[in-house]
Amino acid sequence: MEKTGQNHADIILDTWIPMDSAGHSSKGNQWKWRREDRWYKVDHMGYEGLAETVVSRLMAFADGVSYVSYEPVRMEYKGKIYNGCSSRNFLQEDEELVTVEHLFRQYTGKSLSAEVGKINGVKERILYLSGRIEENTGLKGFGIYLQKILAVDAFFLNEDRHTNNLAVIYRLWEKRYRFSPLFDHGLSLLSDTETDFPLGKPLEECLAEVEAKPFSRDFDEQLDAAEELYGCNVKFRFGKKEVENVLEECGIYYSKETVERVREILYGQMRKYRHMMDGKG
């Protein structure tokens, strides 16, 4: 999308009614709009739009990972300008997105997150969730799919992967399920500058405080358990050059301080997770 300048919007949404994302984020509601075949989301806690676009651009360098592509966008609504992101609707006609929380409640009448929380051991929790979802949907290989999600979330520090943010797609006309592409990475890369990770806070403190979901508060504990069960199924083929290109494209509406923080996080994660880097990290 062609950008029109720092103080101008790419799209005006005055004639469209916003929806909120209640229940789909652990940090409050985020305005979003559906316009024709695209979704638009405004930044709510900080730089979620930047996080969404950076993560999706870098996932283009990962083999075997289906993902939703986001792009940065500046929106005008009722005279105010908002940063955010836009994505194409990934559901086909007569398809619906079903969260694993909703699916589990539908079959058992119980809360999946509560049942998982009763289980001792991260590996056991992962096995329980993947087993129940395979049983309820008929999908095979949900554990490998889940490992990919946990790997991407660990690498990009996604703190919002609760059971209402894990989903499958139901095909109404075929009465069967399919895997959903990876989506919703807005609360990644320490994007919550409003409450938990203000830009003036030392990065080391932020990294020590950020917490994972849904099996453990520790990203590495989740990832290690999933890799022991299903192996490492994500390999990134990007290096610093690709990161710089992505930041130049996606960071156009954000401060230099914000972009520099994201750069520092990414370089640190590339060093930390060398086993996920295919020779360039």
Please report, for each region that a protein language model flagged, where it lies by residue.
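Conserved ATP-binding subdomain of kinase catalytic cores across diverse folds
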Residues: 1-112
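Short helix-capping/linker segments at secondary-structure and domain boundaries
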Residues: 64-66, 160, 276
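Short alpha-helical "patches" and their helix-cap loops
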Residues: 68-78, 162-172, 279-281
